[in-house]
Regions:
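An acidic-aromatic
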Residues: 84-135
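N-terminal leader/targeting segments and the immediate start of mature chains
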Residues: 20-71
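Gly/Pro-enriched, hydrophobic low-complexity segments
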Residues: 152-243
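C-terminal low-complexity, charged extensions that often adopt amphipathic alpha-helices
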Residues: 122, 127-160
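Edge/loop elements at the starts and ends of beta-strands within beta-rich repeat scaffolds
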Residues: 48-56, 68-71, 78, 82, ...
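Sec-dependent bacterial lipoprotein signal peptides
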Residues: 1-20
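Beta-strand-dominated lipid-handling architectures at cellular/organellar boundaries
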Residues: 59, 70-78, 191, 209
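Hydrophobic lipid-interacting interfaces of membrane-associated proteins
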Residues: 63-65, 92-94, 109, 113, ...
Length: 243
């Protein structure tokens, strides 16, 4: 039970995704077609940052803060586009747990107690409450904007409203039934800095935040070497760091 909660908590606050690649200068978004409005051009520039790489493998060091309890371990993150997201946790060189997402379901493996659990996304409370399915999680791990329930964000760009604030521009998605989505980007580069998901109801105090930083390159495109994820409300508060 504790390992299952720990692994699900690992979703809740990711940071430090190490990479051996070097940092490169990030280009400002290019001007779009002449007929596009400035807002359309900016939205297109954000989407254009999406990765062309189909696979990512990285070693990680994870520091987890769950309800005031600090846990540290190593591991690896493996992703294959539209196929799998796998987070393996190790201690003293041995795998102690695994969290695996596929388009169909979620697998949690507890090596210590020799237990595993496989469930649909609707059966995992945290994922259901945050309206997260495989393709939404994939976008979060790959540092991409998304629209819940759709795999083609390009066809949904008219749903986003832009709001500028200092050095950042937010893409706001407020027409979803129960949740509001804010995608905070760096105006100078159109890079996604943070995703915030809030409930629409005043009675729903839950908030899910996924932050990105320390951008490196992956197949010639910027990719965050630092991810930090946190969740509060919904009866729990937790966070963790991947490095």
């Amino acid at each position: 039970k504790h390992m299952k909660y720990f692994l699900l908590t690992a979703l809740v606050s990711l940071a430090f995704l190490t990479s051996c690649r070097t940092l490169q200068n990030i280009q400002k978004p290019s001007a779009g077609a002449a007929h596009q409005s400035q807002e359309q051009q900016y939205k297109a520039a954000v989407v254009a940052k999406a990765q062309t790489a189909q696979c990512v493998t990285a070693k990680i060091n994870m520091d987890v803060d769950a309800d005031g309890k600090q846990i540290s371990c190593g591991g690896s993150l493996k992703m294959k586009r539209d196929d799998v997201i796998q987070l393996s946790l190790t201690f003293l060189g041995f795998e102690v747990g695994r969290l695996e997402f596929t388009p169909k379901d979620v697998l949690v493996v507890d090596r210590i107690h020799k237990q595993y659990s496989r469930a649909s996304y609707g059966e995992v409370d945290f994922l259901r409450q945050a309206d997260l399915d495989f393709y939404t999680l994939q976008s979060l791990f790959w540092n991409e904007i998304f629209t819940p329930g759709s795999r083609d964000v390009r066809s949904q760009l008219n749903r986003f409203r832009l709001a500028a604030s200092g050095d950042h521009t937010s893409l706001l998605l407020t027409d979803a039934p129960k949740l509001n989505y804010q995608f905070l980007t760096r105006t100078s580069s159109a890079l996604l800095d943070r995703v915030t998901v809030d409930g629409k109801s005043t009675a729903d105090q839950g908030q899910f935040v996924w932050k990105y930083d320390n951008f490196t390159t992956l197949s010639g495109k910027p990719f965050p070497a630092l991810m930090e994820v946190s969740i509060n409300g919904m009866g729990k508060k937790a966070g963790f760091t991947l490095a």
